[in-house]
Amino acid sequence: MYLSTSDQKKEATEWFISLRDQICSAFERLEEDYDGPNKSMMPGKFARKHWERDGGGGGVMSIMEGRLFEKVGVNISTVMGTFSQEFSKEITGAQEDPRFWASGISVVAHMWSPHVPAVHMNTRHITTTKSWFGGGSDLTPMIRNDDDRELFHSAFEGTCDKYLSLIHI
């Protein structure tokens, strides 16, 4: 089934909202079920704040501070505008027409334990005269653990390989 560009944008935006809701629910369940240090603290719940972008679009920041997670941000945005002449030379499909549209999600989670690395993930759908998905993920350890790093990267690559034909950097 072919979707028009307008339908693709609508579907992508709705998918990111749904993904945000699923991710926030999963983090809140972990907070509710947690039974370790800081268990006397109240479980974290997400608070949401809407924002608008000058030039078009906006998003919603979802922030949680909890007893397992020191702080988690799950942010979605849908923005549009025109790339500068210089920048449009660097972006696929923007050389012919510098207008863009983008929708995406970003997740950053910091745990209380220094033994658990912070994690970041983002993915986005971008439309110029062409359209594509992009994104990535990483761990930021406070205490280096090569086993964690290798497990993370192999699991991430294995998942991507199941669904996508990508070059992994």
Language-model-detected regions and their locations in the chain:
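Internal mixed beta-strand/loop scaffold within catalytic domains of large alpha/beta enzymes
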Residues: G58-G135
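Conserved small/polar residues in nucleotide/adenosyl-binding loops
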Residues: I167-I169
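Gly/Pro-rich turn-and-neighbor structural signature
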Residues: Y2-T92
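Short, surface-exposed, charged/polar-biased interaction segments
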Residues: R29, D33-P37, D97, I126-K130, ...
